[in-house]
Amino acid sequence: MKEEYNKYKTDTEQRMPTEEEQHLLRMAIGRTSRPAPDVEAEWEKFAETCGKQPVAKHKKKIAVWMAAAAAAVAFVLYLANRPDGFDKQEAFIAVKGITHEVTVQEDDGKPTVVKTRQLDFSRTTHTKDEAGNMTAKKTVVTTSRGMDAQMTLPDGTVVWLNAESRITFTDKYGLETREVNVEGEAYFEVKKDTDHPFIVHTPYFTTKVLGTSFNVKAYRQQTAHVVLVSGKVEVTGKEGDTLIMSPGEIVNTENGGDMKKERTDTYPFVQWKDGFFYFDRTPLADIMRELGRWYNINIVFENPSLMNVNLHFVAEKTQDINDIVKSLDKVIPGKVTIGDNEITLY
């Protein structure tokens, strides 16, 4: 198979993919939990995009790159290049001295590194102080860069916590309400309980649900959002404005400002919990930020105009970063290099 891909032709306008190539493309796209995408349509979109580029300038850069290995598949598709207002070098910086780990901190104690990425708090009991009052002892679960975790809360709600994220809840969870605080990104499959509303607090908004599946992303200095997969939720902004969401909708907010609701394909937003990077028509700056967070590597845009290049990008999170860089270098209208814990785009 490796020999076949070494012979892979990049001139997509002259032929359609073979049956085996279509199969690998489906694998790369990663849609195993629902019907496979229309590979022919994807191929035609790619060919159309290539046809809009000057052949002499982009012949070596505009291509589909595929690599099939025992447990690694990457798929990158160059879609569009939009002008932007950046005129200086831009960078996302790695965190020095970081270790890849998941920690659990009980109340004000010292964080404890756990050896598993699957945590079970379903046996957590409510405690009282000497006066017989319910305590509010905190439990904090934190993931470092390059690590994610799955946990079961006391009521049976399942949470996936993405890299560099934190979730906090107290012993009072489930008494009247089920409340958690999230920084970073988390996906929830909420146990249905109409008597105890489920509430997620972030620095930018509060989400209230009864029983549903949704994704919350609230990293510092990034656009925050809620993506609803099923059920119904109520999102309240920092200024008190409220939006009711239906399945297949996303609510975005910039630094806790005005919220905007629109329809979206929820699939790309939740694939991280299944071990994939999945971006669809996403600016290269956002993609590189996520890669930098996962691999804890510096990202430097020597050519800031590349930040708004849109890509369709899929890769397993176990993929070697060097392979990802090689694939990006083949498709963007520029150059990508890696060395000394730094990826440079120019």
Feature names for model-found ranges:
Residues 10-46:
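A short, acidic loop/turn at secondary-structure junctions
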Residues 22-27, 257-346:
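N-terminal export/assembly leaders
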Residues 46-221, 237-256, 339-340:
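Short acidic/polar, Gly/Pro-enriched loop/turn segments located at secondary-structure boundaries
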Residues 227-228:
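Propeptide (latency) domains of metzincin metalloproteases
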